[in-house]
Swiss-Prot record:
Tree of life domain: Bacteria
Gene: rsmH
Keywords: Cytoplasm, Methyltransferase, rRNA processing, S-adenosyl-L-methionine, Transferase
UniProt: S-adenosyl-L-methionine binding residues: 32-34, 52, 79, 100, 107
Alphabetical list of SUPFAM superfamilies matching this protein: Putative methyltransferase TM0872, insert domain (SSF81799), S-adenosyl-L-methionine-dependent methyltransferases (SSF53335)
EC number assigned by the record: 2.1.1.199
Family per record: Belongs to the methyltransferase superfamily. RsmH family.
Protein name: Ribosomal RNA small subunit methyltransferase H
Biological process per Gene Ontology, one example term: rRNA base methylation
Keyword Transferase: yes
Keyword rRNA processing: yes
Amino acid sequence: MFKHETVLLHETVDMLEVKPDGIYVDATLGGAGHSEYLLNKLNEKGHLFAFDQDQTAIDNAKIKLADYSDKVTFIKANFRDMKEALNERGIEAVDGILYDLGVSSPQLDERERGFSYHQDAALDMRMDQEQELTAKIVVNEWSYQDLIRIFFQYGEEKFSKQIAREIERRREVKPIETTGELVDIIKTAIPAPARRKGGHPGKRTFQAIRIAVNDELGAVEDSLEKALTLLKPGGRISVITFHSLEDRITKHLFQEATKGPDLPPGLPVIPDEYKPDFKLATRKPIVPSEEELEQNNRARSAKLRVIEKIIK
C-alpha cells in the first residue's frame, strides 16, 4: 500500500487561506495527504487539480480520495508542465498551489525502483517510469567530469572526485548494474574516518544521481516560475523543501518576485505599475514542530515558504 507521512500538513494548506469555492493545485500529489486535507475545505463549487508523474501515486490517490471524485482532477504529468496542462483544461488562473518537494517515502522504499542505498536493486531512480534516462545510464555513460559536477552540485559531496574516479575504474571492467554495487564503490572511494560520520556514505551521491535523472532542480525552477503567473490576486503558493538546493531556488525566486521593477529616480509617489506584484507570506520559513519530528523523522529538514499575489 502507498503510505506516506505528510509533512507540515496543516501549515502548508492553512497558509493557502483556502476559499471553499476556489480552484487549487497540488503540484506533488504523492500520498495525497495534503490533497485530502485541502479537499475537505472545498464546497461543491471548489476544485483541485492534482499532479504526479508516477502512475502508482495517482492510482492509489483515486482510491484514497474516492469520496471527493467530483471535486478533483488527476493529471499524470511533471509539474513543470502544469501551466500547459491547466490551460488545456480551460484554467487560466488559480487561487492556490502547493508543492511538497520531498520524494514520496513509498518510492524510496520500493526496492525495485532503485532509489534506496539500503536495499540492493537495479539502478533506476526514475520518477516517471516511461522516461528513458535511468541511474544506470548516468553511472555507466556520463563522463568523469559530469559525474564530479553532479555529485558536487546536487549532492554537496566532498569526495566527488574520488567517487567518480572509482566509478570510472569499475565500469571499465564491467557495467555497474545495481544499487548495491554503487554503495560498495562509494564505500571504497570515501576514506574510512569520513565514512563513519554523518549518516550513510551513499546518501549524497544517491541524492545527486536522483536529481540528475529526474532533472529535479530544473523542474522546480521552471514550475515555480510558471506557478507565479497562474495565481489570481490574493492567491498563494506554499512550497515545502527538504534540502538546501531546492530551498535556495525557492527563496531566490520568491525574493525576485517581491522586488518589482526598478524605479526611476526622484519619484514623489510610487505608481502602481512600479509596485511589486507579490509579497512574502512567510518572512522566515516555517519548520516542523518538535511533536511532528517525534512522529516523523523524515520531516527534520523540511522548510515551508509561502508567497502571495498582491491585490491591487
